[in-house]
Amino acid sequence: MPDKVPYFDLPAQIRSVRKDLDAVIAKTLDNTSFCLGPDTAQFEKDFAKYCGAEHCAGFNSGTSALHVALMLLNVGRGDEVISTPHTFVATSWAISYVGAKPVYV
């Protein structure tokens, strides 16, 4: 089979938006607004609109997002959360952070 379709070709995916990405990254690094700040607020507003949602909250990591999601669902001590063992460890961390027990299936 001489012609294989690449499983993952990040350079091809980025090529069409590279100049825009470089400009936004440079602006963000120059004004150090990569945590909170006006760019984050604008992203949250735009993404909420795009999703048809009233609100959007950006997080610094998937761990933080999972942790807050579990808190908002009132998951806590004594609860069990069904998860998969085939995931990043942050999934289990977030469950443990709220005092719940991960149950792997």
Please identify what each model-predicted range represents.
Residues 71-105:
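PLP-dependent aminotransferase-like
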Residues 1-72, 76-77, 97-98:
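Conserved PLP-binding active-site segment in aminotransferase class I/II-type PLP enzymes
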